[in-house]
């Protein structure tokens, strides 16, 4: 990171369309390392720090020299990248070749390069002399995309820009794959990773640390956004190691079926979906629960004396008394007195959405654009609503988030409760969330932070004085009240094995956190800083940001203003060239955001430079384009 660029900014205004100083400083590093030196880089910037914009700005610079391929995990994130590409282009202030930038989801990229599940090696020559940018790089390994990336690296000898806020997920294996992809050497995983009997005992050994430092020296960019401008987090529940957890004591009904599942069906309970399910809610016989297609065809099937299912619809008093779910019993009782929007995480792949829907409806909460709840709770004369996001509804997620994040919904009056599975763990931003709930304990520390990071991030809150409440719910036995104060108390298997599933998962999470933090610390130490004049390829981009910052505070100045000239000559040393640049931005009516006039253009008026406000106006319905037909029909009124 080029700290010399950061030093050019004083009291940077972040509330307008802008490129942050650390983003420009990182862009300088990427251009020098990837384009000039043809070396790969791991952009390890903690969530919420704006690494997407950095990557897209870099793609615009690189497009002048090479083709750039950007891979993203899924179609929804592809839409986010396409939108952000428009933002990046508007802020770029320099030439680029858009035709040289290709953005693919991993699925479409797989289809492009495989024939009948076999890599089309003849087609890989198209990637010669190109650059690859991989979003959420920690997720591409262990599947065909990871294999394809390795083949392209070995065949085409091209550099990669890998984006990640989480380089280690369940084990250090992921980090090993990243090292392998970024370096010119083949990694022997057996030499760098120590393995115990359990996953939590898989560690990067000292040899691995040395390999990491040797092979990735000069290839790491680490950045963590300062905590300023963020609301405080208020964790609820009882103290549990270094956090707080809400103990939700199971009823006799839930505990009975929970124990049947644990003792008889789960030989590897830490990874068994049934334990995820019964820890959130029990629904009777597991053989039925694991065959939902069959269950949904049942007519008035009794699951419990006070709970039945009919054609996929749950009904009965149990949805209100909630003996089937200690977590939802706590949740429903608690939300009645809370104000603001809620984000609720769950990862129950089999019947999570089914349970959530009918518990919410039965307790007076209405489905967004769906069924109305029984005796509905109201806000501003409208029903309080909920929505459930799963991988099956990807096509409508963007529209749903537009509603959830809209200023009109800051109080939750349009959509109050957003339930989501793992699909929301990455690349999405939620605004004005005041309550974050974990119905399922995340698998890793990285995933936990990703979920929090959807909401608690810069620019997500207008009022940061009000705290964000976090509830980490754990289903526990009716008589369980253990104080968990130290990991050292749970080093023996016999002590861990008797714990409730959620408590074991929390301990697993904390064991892994120690290893994750160790690797984060190593990466932070390896991230290099330097102070140099800006790279020639980003001079205009940097100047554009300096100009935006200058004219935010200045509505009218003399054409020969010494402060403006001093600012420009801090980048362009030649005064004549600096004056020519000022002529160009004024005559080209450079776009700025001014604190008095808001959106404005620069104009010369007599001997002054002035900011002239503008707005776009148009006649409604001048053109209508029907994209639903096989051909476009253009009509005018």
From Swiss-Prot:
Gene Ontology cellular-component terms listed: virion component
Domain of life per record: Viruses
Matches recorded under PROSITE patterns: DEAH_ATP_HELICASE, HELICASE_ATP_BIND_1, HELICASE_CTER
InterPro entries found in the cross-reference section: DNA/RNA_helicase_DEAH_CS (IPR002464), Helicase/UvrB_N (IPR006935), Helicase_ATP-bd (IPR014001), Helicase_C-like (IPR001650), P-loop_NTPase (IPR027417)
Domain Helicase C-terminal: 327-507
An example Gene Ontology molecular-function term: hydrolase activity
Domain Helicase ATP-binding: 32-185
Keywords: Activator, ATP-binding, DNA-binding, Helicase, Hydrolase, Late protein, Nucleotide-binding, Transcription, Transcription regulation, Virion
Signal sequence, start to end: none
Class in the EC hierarchy, top level: hydrolase
Subcellular location, principal: virion
Annotated compartments: Virion
Enzyme Commission number(s): 3.6.4.-
Binding-site residues, ATP: 45-52
Position of sequence motif DEXH box: 135-138
Family affiliation: Belongs to the helicase family. VETF subfamily.
Subunit structure: Heterodimer of a 70 kDa and a 82 kDa subunit. Part of the early transcription complex composed of ETF, RAP94/OPG109, and the DNA-directed RNA polymerase.
Function: Acts with RNA polymerase to initiate transcription from early gene promoters. Is recruited by the RPO-associated protein of 94 kDa RAP94/OPG109 to form the early transcription complex, which also contains the core RNA polymerase. ETF heterodimer binds to early gene promoters.
Name recorded for this polypeptide: Early transcription factor 70 kDa subunit
Source organism (scientific name): Vaccinia virus (strain Western Reserve) (VACV)
Gene name of the record: OPG118
């Amino acid at each position: 990171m080029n700290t010399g660029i950061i030093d050019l900014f004083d009291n940077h205004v972040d509330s307008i369309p802008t490129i942050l100083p650390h983003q420009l400083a990182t862009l300088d590093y990427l251009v020098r390392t990837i384009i000039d030196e043809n070396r790969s880089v791991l952009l390890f910037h903690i969530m919420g720090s704006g690494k997407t914009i950095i990557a897209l700005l870099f793609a615009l610079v690189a497009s002048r020299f090479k083709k750039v391929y950007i891979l993203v995990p899924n179609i929804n994130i592809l839409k986010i990248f396409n939108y952000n590409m428009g933002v990046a282009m508007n802020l770029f202030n320099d030439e680029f070749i858009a035709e040289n930038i290709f953005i693919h989801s991993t699925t479409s990229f797989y289809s492009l390069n495989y024939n009948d599940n076999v890599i089309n090696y003849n087609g890989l020559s198209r990637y010669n002399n190109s650059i690859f940018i991989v979003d959420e790089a920690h997720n591409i390994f262990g599947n065909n995309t990871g294999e394809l990336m390795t083949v392209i690296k070995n065949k085409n000898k091209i550099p990669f820009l890998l984006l990640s806020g989480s380089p280690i997920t369940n084990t250090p294996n992921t980090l090993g794959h990243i090292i392998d992809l970024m370096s010119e050497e083949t990694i022997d995983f057996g030499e760098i990773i120590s393995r115990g009997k359990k996953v939590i005992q898989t560690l990067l050994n000292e040899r691995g640390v040395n390999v990491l430092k040797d092979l990735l020296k000069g290839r790491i960019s680490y950045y963590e956004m300062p905590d300023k401008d963020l609301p405080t987090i208020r964790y609820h529940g009882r103290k549990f190691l270094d956090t707080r957890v809400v103990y939700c004591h199971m009823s006799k009904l839930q505990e009975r079926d929970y124990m049947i599942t644990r003792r008889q069906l789960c030989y590897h309970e830490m990874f068994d979906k049934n334990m995820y399910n019964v820890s959130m809610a029990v629904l009777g016989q597991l053989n039925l629960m694991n065959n939902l297609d069959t269950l949904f065809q049942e007519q008035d099937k009794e699951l419990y004396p006070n709970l039945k299912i009919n054609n996929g619809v749950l009904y009965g008093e149990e949805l209100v008394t909630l003996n089937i779910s200690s977590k939802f019993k706590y949740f429903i009782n608690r939300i009645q007195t809370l104000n603001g929007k809620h984000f609720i995480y769950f990862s129950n792949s089999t019947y999570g959405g089914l349970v959530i829907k009918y518990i919410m409806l039965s307790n007076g909460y209405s489905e967004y654009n769906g069924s109305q709840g029984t005796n509905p709770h109201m806000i501003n004369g409208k029903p309080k609503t909920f929505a459930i996001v799963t991988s099956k509804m990807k096509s409508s997620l963007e529209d749903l988030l537009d509603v959830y994040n809209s200023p009109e919904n800051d109080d939750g009056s349009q959509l109050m409760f957003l339930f989501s599975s793992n699909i929301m763990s990455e690349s999405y931003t939620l605004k004005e969330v005041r309550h974050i709930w974990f119905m399922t304990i995340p698998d890793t520390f990285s995933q936990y932070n990703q979920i929090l990071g959807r909401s608690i991030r810069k620019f997500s809150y207008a009022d940061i004085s009000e705290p964000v409440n976090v509830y980490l719910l754990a289903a526990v036995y009716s008589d369980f009240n253990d104080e968990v104060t130290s990991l050292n108390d749970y080093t023996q298997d016999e002590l861990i094995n008797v714990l409730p599933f959620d408590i074991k998962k929390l301990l697993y999470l904390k064991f892994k956190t120690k290893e994750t933090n160790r690797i984060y610390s190593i990466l932070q130490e390896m991230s290099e800083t330097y102070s140099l004049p800006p790279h020639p390829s980003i001079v205009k981009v940097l100047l554009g940001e300096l100009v935006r910052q200058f004219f935010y505070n200045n509505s009218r100045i003399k054409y020969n203003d010494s402060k403006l000239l001093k600012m420009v000559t801090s980048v362009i040393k030649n005064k004549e060239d600096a004056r020519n640049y000022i002529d160009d931005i004024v005559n080209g009516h450079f776009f700025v955001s001014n604190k008095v006039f808001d959106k404005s253009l620069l104009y010369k008026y007599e001997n002054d430079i002035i900011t002239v406000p503008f707005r776009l106006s148009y006649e409604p319905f001048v053109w209508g384009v029907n994209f639903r037909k096989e051909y476009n029909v253009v009509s005018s009124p």
